[in-house]
Regions:
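Polyanion-engaging groove/track-forming segments
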Residues: 1-709
Length: 712
């Protein structure tokens, strides 16, 4: 059974899920509830809601849709590995091996030209990664293409990039077979999975008894088809937040519309049913010849493209109409915000532009608003700093006016959380006394949240480093690195002064200077500065020069040991510079991360997680390459770029919903109900963000309905 619950309020859908868990078919106590979500924030909110309702929330799993679907493949079909051999990372390394062998072929003349000057393999690695990412999307949205390419066939009407993408995909499949890895991937598994479930007279062993899908704004068509087949044996409840009670999707053709007009949704907890269309008799006039619905509400039409496609797909998989449940909640028209929401809910357009005098004088659609209505406000500010200051003032006013409102009832969603984090810290963090608001910033990139992560990336750049004095001293700003060399804040202040006054500018020594094709001068290097500092400990500058070096007088007494600590740091930097310069096979890079962390960091309780994240991601990169049998030496720069990208993708979200004001990134899946919702950084060109597609992305050049593409 597959059932879709439509409601304009997520808390109503969550209450329905609680009702089903409590009243309908209780599971075996040892069988986990399966709830598909699209973000950890949604999972946290659902757990808290369950705990509040039942007193405890335990034995609940919150998988992402892609991992859940693959897990179902493993449970239903024989000989399916737990990890796909066609994951994005695995395909990247395999393409690194395959591409050089295929470049001499005529179809690859464009790639051959692009990779002609690539001594460090950086272009090859980037091309392999981008192509793997594209194939990963094809597996979900164009699986039929890959099946044809695998059979040696081309697709009519595709752009020229197909000429090399098709044979490259076939070579990738053959290479995977040569490695002895399973050739199963999502493109060739969906049909087999669906056919197996449809042919089964009883549920295959290991399937969950019940599955909820909550808080997901869109799923790809192949996922929905797989869930539809799974629904023959499993109770599947799709809880869909739908802003409009009437059908507002598009149609395929007139016959599809004829079936749709007869469909009805069953009203929750009632015996009556409700038609999908506001007026079924005139439904045919709503659609163009192409099947596009002319929505009367302009806001829903312009902002609801993703939802419109998803509505179409949901109506297709519940073609009988018996699986649709109406749980919409009426909205009173007592404020500006509620009027807008009510218009969307009822698919109305009561807006009056008032461009002409006649339109301005009309009153049939006008609604009276309270001059003091602040349910929806827009603030135009001259800078991000001012945006955050106004936000802080408004939140204080709201909390003062409403004694029942608490900081945890407020969410601030930011279009670019990384850019606004410094301003948020400056405004919210500097407030004291009655103006202080507890707050928690989620979803920042891990690299920006932990200085140790950025310090490690800087250390991986040692082979190319000029050892500029400020860059080296900046490493000591990281407490766990400074602690490894026994340098505290006061010691760092002394060292900054000494380094500047002793004339250190850049370069470890003269040999390092010569590496940049510059003549050695014997001055302004770290070796020169350390010599001056150590001489200053042994003699005074008034005694003259020693071997043409004038002693530096400040590094004397008990604090002179700082020079030794600084020298230890520079020795380690120089040693690792030489160690990291040569390309190595992946097996030899495996232990480098642990050794560098040991040599440069003395972790404390605050940074242990960051250190573990570095090692975890490093090992994942190495293991993926080794499992893909990539055996060529690679330079450190490739591993550094990949590690940097992965750390940027890691978002720190564990403090979301922890109690203070929730400040997070703006995500369509984070539709968690709050009493106050604030948006920051909604500037032109920033949101919605326009992402230019790859020049060889065949999907962007031949678009179809690609529901959920940006959210999988």
């Amino acid at each position: 059974m597959l059932r879709v619950y439509h409601s304009n309020r997520l808390d109503v859908l969550e209450a329905l899920m609680e009702f089903i868990v409590e009243r309908e078919h209780p599971l075996d106590p040892f069988e986990p509830e399966m709830v598909l979500v699209q973000s950890t924030g949604m999972a946290q909110w659902l757990q808290m809601s369950f705990a509040q309702k039942f007193g405890i929330a335990a034995n609940i799993e919150f998988p992402l849709p892609a991992s859940f679907i693959w897990d179902m493949f493993v449970r239903v079909l024989p000989d399916i590995p737990k990890q796909s051999a066609f994951s994005k990372q695995s395909m990247s390394w395999k393409l690194m091996s395959i591409l050089p062998e295929m470049l001499p072929r005529d179809e690859f003349v464009m790639l051959r030209h692009y990779l002609s000057d690539d001594t460090d393999k950086r272009k090859l690695f980037q091309l392999a990664s981008r192509t793997a990412d594209l194939y990963d999307q094809y597996l979900v949205y164009r699986s039929q293409w890959l099946n044809c390419w695998e059979a040696g066939e081309l697709i009519d009407g595709l752009p020229d990039a197909q000429i090399w993408q098709a044979p490259l995909w076939k070579a990738l499949v053959e290479h995977t077979e040569k490695l002895g890895q399973p050739q199963w991937h999502r493109a060739n598994l969906y049909d087999r999975f669906i056919a197996t479930l449809e042919a089964a007279s009883k549920p295959p062993e290991g399937l969950p008894s019940r599955v909820f899908i909550c808080g997901i704004s869109a799923l790809p068509p192949v996922y929905l088809n797989a869930l539809k087949a799974l629904g023959r044996h499993v109770d599947i409840h799709i809880l869909f937040t739908n802003p409009c009670r009437h059908y507002w999707g598009d149609i395929q053709d007139s016959r599809w519309l004829a079936r749709l007009v007869t469909r009805q949704r069953r009203r929750i907890f009632e015996e009556r049913s409700i038609p999908l269309f506001k007026d079924s008799a005139t439904a045919a006039h709503l659609f163009s010849e192409e099947g596009i619905q002319d929505l009367p509400n302009p806001l829903l039409a312009s902002w609801g493209k993703l939802g419109r496609d998803y509505i179409h797909m949901l109506s297709d998989i519940t073609s009988s109409g018996e699986g649709d449940v109406d749980a919409f909640v009426d909205i009173s028209s007592d404020s500006l915000l509620h009027n807008i929401q009510s218009d969307i809910l009822d698919l109305e357009n009561r807006a009056i532009a008032g461009i002409t005098a006649e339109e301005f004088a009309r009153s049939d659609k006008k609604r009276k608003l309270d001059p003091d209505d602040r349910s929806l406000t827009i603030h135009m500010c001259h800078s991000p700093q001012r945006e955050v200051e106004i936000l802080h003032d408004k939140l204080l006013a709201l909390l003062q006016d409403d004694p029942e409102l608490t900081p945890r009832d407020i969410v601030v969603m930011v279009a670019d959380i990384d850019s606004y984090s410094p301003f948020i810290q400056a405004v919210f963090g500097s407030a004291t006394g009655e103006r202080y608001l507890p707050y928690a910033v989620s979803d920042r990139r891990a690299r920006q949240s932990h200085p140790a992560l950025q310090a490690f990336i800087s250390l991986l750049s040692l082979p190319d480093s000029r050892f500029i004095s400020e860059d080296v001293l900046a490493l000591l700003d990281v407490p766990v690195l400074a602690a490894r060399f026994d340098i505290d804040e006061e010691g760092l202040r002394y060292l900054r002064q000494w380094v500047n006054e002793s004339g250190v500018r850049w370069g470890i020594d003269d040999d390092n200077v010569q590496e940049f094709s510059l003549p050695p001068t014997g001055q302004h290097t770290w070796a020169f500065g350390l010599t001056r500092m150590l001489l200053g400990y042994a003699m005074e500058s008034s005694q003259g020069e020693w071997n043409d070096v004038l002693p530096y007088d400040e590094s004397t007494g008990l604090i002179a040991e700082l020079v030794g600590h600084l020298a230890s740091l520079l020795m380690q930097l120089n040693r690792w510079k030489r160690e990291l310069m040569q390309p190595r096979p992946l097996e030899e890079w495996q232990t480098i991360c642990r050794e560098m962390l040991t040599d440069f960091f003395l972790p404390d309780s605050d940074t242990e997680a960051a250190m573990a994240l570095i090692e975890q991601q490093w090992q994942a990169i190495i293991d993926e390459g080794i499992s893909s049998h990539y055996d060529q030496p690679i330079p450190l720069s490739l591993l550094r770029d990949e590690l940097t990208q992965r750390l940027d993708q890691e978002r720190i979200s564990q403090r979301f919903l922890a109690g203070p004001v929730n400040i997070c990134t703006l995500m369509p899946m984070r539709s968690i109900p709050f009493k106050v919702v604030c948006l920051l950084g909604m500037n032109d060109g920033i949101y919605p963000r326009a992402l230019a597609p790859l020049g060889f992305d065949l999907m962007s050049q031949q678009p179809q309905r690609e529901i959920g593409r940006a959210h999988v």
